Every structure is written in C-alpha cells, then in structure tokens.
Design a protein with these regions (language model features):
Chain B
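N-terminal hydrophobic/helix-forming segments and targeting peptides
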Residues: 1-336
Length: 345, 336
C-alpha cells in the first residue's frame, strides 16, 4: 500500500531521497521513467491526447518534519534541533531513528520522582536529548555524526475508518498523486505530477517545477491541519475529519486563485460532493511558491484533513482520502480548472 | 531463559495495579522447573518456593504492576479524558496508548496534540495537565469504552548493545533477576529455603508484598526494585549502568543483610554500588520489614523511570542474579 510504505520511509527536509526513489520505482514505466531535477524533485508526466496544449500540475511534497543532531554531549546524549515546525512537547518519551542506518534511540526525560521545580516547567529544546545507549561522547561518535537526521519512529496503522502514522503531511498527498497517476485515463490536456522537496523549511523545492513544465494551473494536495480537538470550539477548527476534501481559499502568503476556488466549489455543489472549506488560514503550502515564482501560476488547494500533524502520530480519515482523490480526478476529467481560467481576470 | 526475549514479552504485557494476570502468566512459565511450589494468592501475587535444607527462609519480591491511566470521561466523537497513577503528564502528547475495556477488548488510541500551526502564543507556553489532554479513539469502535477502563502506553521495546528500552521494566526486569537467580541456584547448594513473590499493586502502596510477607513469614526479606540511574543530584551518588547491583544501606535495610550482600559481592568480584537510604526506600521492603523481617533492598539502575521508554543495562541483570544466588547459598542457620 502506497500510503503505508510512504509514511514508514524516513525523509525529513533535505533527506527525501528514499521517498523519491520509492515513488519513482512504483510509478516508472519504459514510456515514462520519471524525471528528477537537481534539487531532488520528481516529476511524472501524463501526456494529453493531442487535442489541448494545456498543462495542469498536481503537487505534493515528499519531505516531513524531523530533527537533526546538533551536538554530541560528553555523556553520550545527542542534542537535536527541529527541521520544520516541531513542538518539543510531542517528543518526550518517544522512540526515534537516528542517522542513515536508522539507529534506534529514545528521547528520554528525567523521571517524575527526580523533578523539582522543573515538574511545572515547559520542556524546551535544551531538555530534548536523544539517548542511543552510549554512555560517553566517544562511544556515541562511533555511530553518530553531527548533522545526522533524526526521524520519528511510528509504525503505520490502518483501521476501518482511519489511517494513523507519522508524516501524513504530506505523504497522504504523495500517495493520492501516485494513485491518480495510475488510475487517470488519458485526458485532452497534459497532467504533470510533481513530488517536491523541502516544503517544510520554507517551500523551497516547488518553484523549479514551473520552469520545466509551464503549467496553466495547479492543485496542491496537502495533509492539512484538522484541529478538531476537544479543547477547540467548533468555530476554531480548521477542518473536521470525515467531512470530505478541504478546499482552501486563503493561506499564509497566498489568496488562492479565486477563479479556481469558485469553480471547484461550484463543481462540488453541482455534483453534490461532500466537501469543507478550510476554516483557518494558517500554514503555507507550495501554492504560495507557485503563485509567486516566474510568471505565477494560478493555484488551488484541495486537501486531506489531518489531525496532530508535525507530531509522531497523525490521523486521517480513510473516507476523506478516497473522496479527495475522486474529487480531484473529477475536477481534472471535467476540465474544471481550464474552463475557469477562460474567464478573464 | 533468553533475557532479551523475556524482557520484551514482559514489557509488552498488560498489568496495571490489580490487573497483573498477563504478567503472572509469563512468570509462571519462566519459573517452570526451577521451583518446588508455585501458587497464586488472593492478593494476586505469584508465589514460588524452592526448598533448600530448611535451615531458614529468605524471601524476594519484585512487583509486576506498572504505572497506568484511567478513563475519566468518554466524550462524543471518540475522545477520552484521563486520570493517571505515577506518570508524568508532560510525556503524554502524541503518545499512543492501549485502552483495556472491561469487556476484555484492547483498543488503540492516540493522545492528540494541536499542530504547531494552530497554536497561539498562549497555548505554546501551556503545560498540559490531565484537564487538557485527550485520547483520540475515533479509529476504533469506542462504544464499549467506559469510565474506569485502564489505559497503558502502547510502544515497542527494543535493545541496542547492552541496553534495553521499554515500558514497565520497573519492576518486571527485577522479576527477571529472580528467575535468573533461581536458575543459578539449581547449580548451588543452599541451606535456606527460597521464597519469592512476583508481587502485585506496588505502584499504589506495595500491598502485594505485605500480604506475601505475612503469609510466608520469612527470616530475611529482600525487595528487588529499580533505582534511578544517572541521577545528577549532587546529594546522592550517581548510579551508573554496567557497574553492577545497587545495595541499599540505611534505616530499613537490616545492617546484617546489607553487610552480607556487600561481603558476598567483594568475595566474588561482583561490581556493586551503594545507595544510602535514610528513611523509607519506596520499595516493597518498606512493607516487608513490618512483618518483623530482616529486610534488604537490591536495586537495578534504570533511567527514565515511569516513562514509555525506561532504560536498563542487561549486564546489570546478570550480575545482580549472580550476587543474589551466591548470597542465598552463603546463608547459614542463625544468620539473623
């Protein structure tokens, strides 16, 4: 299963090689072996039948948040810093993978019995230490180097209605694109599937796609924040699991193209598709980069609602995943984006 | 017994205070062939007896129970609120857990945490308490979950080098020491009869050890428990990994017992460490002594106590078992 495999592969920003290789291995054919650019982005092209010279871009990012070893202490413990947005509170007492060889380690924490004033203090990065069982610096240095990546250890689980695992942001998007690449018939126009690097550290990979393919419009697919936690009032939720694909209208750095947005919403209404509008504007996506690079590509966001992202365990709804996939397939087949862009700004 | 395999099974087993059946079953298997009598008492202790020459009795206890949580409320849409015994709430966000329903089902849950994107300046600084934390059980049919169901950590123990990481090594790793001591005793002569309790309900007050000590009335009683490794407090010695068992000296451990343990270690070249214990030890021994027993405590260094990944050094298990077997075999009539 694509999603399970993708979530269990480790690939924090800048270390996406294994994710990319997996996707390429699974999708490649003699006609389309896939293209990799110098940054590590991977592209698969599905040519049109010749009746249209337009190109639609689908995009998901291959990287995940993680940690990097920034110091090896005299006592053998490893200090780490976050790669992307990681809250230190989700790390304590968790198991991790250290380095290229996936050395097991634990983010240990002082026993409750030994805590004094620190019992009431917020754990910060100065307290997050990875223990690989080394008792001295020299011992740790045998198997760990400064700059080694540290990834969450989190076996993927499948339930009747849910998927649970790390990195659903955005391996859920990657798995969805992979499935669409396999399942979509040949359309009138070209479709480019872009699996891009380094989203989590500032949308760094996606821009290069535009130079290569000059798409007319794009859909970015993200495992996006849910926030439907009991502590938040309903009106502060971002999205809600099981309520269908989440369409975004404004996000950090970009108001998504209103023509595409309106057309997608109208299409969903017309077809009677269960969907939701993303209730919060927090978080950027590669859409921001696409809209602000080179000539600026009109961009839409159709997302899979995900709980507890950027932590070792995130949760999505199986139904949402399937519905989002089908919805995007229908948008492409019925050329909703291209029709919308025929309207002049 | 394969120590690593046993530690793994024991770490994964379910056994909050008073619910130690699974752990009891495992130990029953491990002591098979090493003892003359095995029985379970009404407190939930697993008691074993290995007879020597009936010149006296020495008793060991190691507790089977683990720290845990309880469901305090079931919210609609598949969220639970929790209460806890003995665990640090700070370690719970993004922790996977098992919910053990009264009907005997084991369901998975995830302690959710608001993504950084949705945090505010205020929530970023907030120390979560049980009033904030919740378990997401929306992935399971949660209709059978009810208030009072036990909740335990769901994680995967592992070993690296001489170290083993996992939950509930406090105090099941000491249960392994008892088994390994019994293995060694099969090759040694011992005058004393050896009793041992894999005890229940230590984490809420050492009830199990008390009732076992009452029933058995031993001459000598030694609790095997874990102690903090690499505590950086300047007021206590740093118990280190790989440096052998930690022998308690102080008010509750009987001087003769502590001395005899130290002597045995010295004579046999077993490394050992000393832990001063001015008042209560926080182990089963505090209860065992009350039955007018010459008490002792031998501890296994453990780091990250009560967290999902406690750490121990497997070499320390072997050295402690060796010390205890030799200690038992050195006991002579009238020693206390």
């Amino acid at each position: 299963m694509f999603l399970k495999d993708l979530c269990e592969i480790n690939g924090a920003s800048g270390n996406e090689d294994r994710v990319r290789s997996y996707i390429q291995e699974q999708l490649k054919s003699p006609e389309e072996p896939g293209q990799v650019d110098v940054l590590g982005n991977l592209f698969f092209e599905k040519k049109g039948n010749g009746t249209s010279d337009k190109t639609i871009l689908l995009m998901a990012h291959t990287d995940e948040v993680g940690l990097m070893v920034t110091n090896i202490q005299d006592d053998g413990l490893l200090a780490v810093s976050p790669i992307g947005g990681v809250d230190p509170r989700v790390l304590l007492g968790k198991r991790v993978w250290v380095g290229e060889n996936n050395l097991p380690g634990v983010i240990g924490y002082k026993a409750i019995h030994l805590q004094k004033e620190d019992f009431k203090t917020l754990p910060d990065w100065d307290k997050v230490r990875v223990d690989i069982g080394a008792q001295k610096k020299e011992e740790a240095q045998k198997s760990v180097n400064l700059g080694d990546y540290v990834h969450f250890y989190s076996p993927f689980e499948e339930y009747e209605n849910r998927y649970v695992g790390k990195a659903l942001d955005d391996r859920a998007g990657c798995a969805l694109l992979m499935a669409l690449y396999r399942e979509l018939p040949v359309l009138n126009h070209r479709v480019v599937f872009a699996f891009v690097v380094q989203e989590e550290i500032g949308l760094r990979g996606s821009g290069s796609t535009l130079k290569r393919y000059k798409p007319d419009a794009a859909i970015v697919v993200e495992g996006t924040t849910a926030g439907d936690n009991p502590e938040l009032k309903r009106e502060r939720w971002s999205t809600h699991l099981d309520n269908g694909p989440a369409i975004s209208y404004l996000q950090s750095g970009y108001a998504l193209d209103y023509r595409l947005f309106e057309a997608i919403v109208a299409f969903a209404n017309q077809k009677g598709i269960l969907y939701q509008l993303k209730g919060r504007t927090v978080g950027g996506t590669d859409g921001t980069r696409l809209a602000s690079t080179y000539f600026g590509v009109p961009c839409a966001g159709v997302n899979i609602p995900s709980r507890y992202i950027h932590s070792p365990v995130s949760v999505i709804s199986k139904k949402d995943f399937e519905n989002t996939k089908q919805f995007i397939a229908d948008i492409l087949t019925e050329e909703i984006l291209l029709k919308a862009l025929e309207v002049k700004v | 017994m394969d120590t690593f395999a046993a530690l793994k099974s024991l770490s994964l087993a379910y056994g909050p205070p008073g619910r130690e059946k699974e752990v009891r079953g495992l130990f029953k298997g491990y002591v098979n062939g090493l003892v003359d009598e095995v029985f379970e008492d009404t407190s939930g202790n697993l008691i074993v007896k290995r007879y020597g020459q009936h010149k006296g009795t020495v008793f060991f206890s190691a507790h089977m129970d683990e720290v845990c949580f309880l469901v305090s409320k079931v919210l609609p849409e598949g969220f639970l609120r929790l209460e806890g015994i003995g665990a640090d709430v700070k370690l719970l966000p993004s922790q996977k857990v098992w919910i053990h329903t009264r009907s005997g089902k084991r369901l998975r849950g995830v302690i959710g945490m608001l993504a950084p994107h949705l945090q505010t300046e205020e929530t970023r600084k907030k120390l979560n308490g049980f009033e904030d934390l919740f378990v997401d059980v929306s992935m399971s049919d949660f209709s059978e979950i009810s208030v009072g169901d036990f909740v335990t950590y769901d994680n995967e123990p592992f070993s690296t080098g001489d170290f083993f990481f996992g939950k509930s090594l406090d105090d099941r790793a000491c249960g392994v020491i008892i088994v390994k001591m019994l293995e060694r005793l099969t090759a040694l002569r011992h005058d004393f009869d050896v009793f041992a309790a894999f005890s229940s309900r230590e984490e809420i007050g050492a009830f199990g050890a008390r009732t076992a000590a009452y029933a058995l009335q031993p001459d000598i009683g030694i609790a095997l428990d874990v102690t903090h490794a690499i505590d950086t407090s300047p007021n206590y010695p740093k118990n280190e990994f790989g440096k052998g068992p930690v022998i308690a000296v102080g008010a509750i451990p009987h001087r003769k017992i502590s001395n005899l343990l130290i002597e045995t270690a010295k004579q046999n070249g077993i490394p050992y460490q000393i832990e001063p214990s001015p008042s209560r030890t926080g182990t089963d021994t505090d209860q065992i002594q009350l039955e007018t027993v010459a008490a002792g405590v031998v501890s296994l260094p453990l780091r990250y106590m009560h967290t999902p990944y406690e750490q121990i050094c497997v070499k320390d298990i072997d050295e402690t078992a060796r010390l205890l077997a030799l200690f038992v075999s050195a006991l002579k009539e009238g020693v206390v």
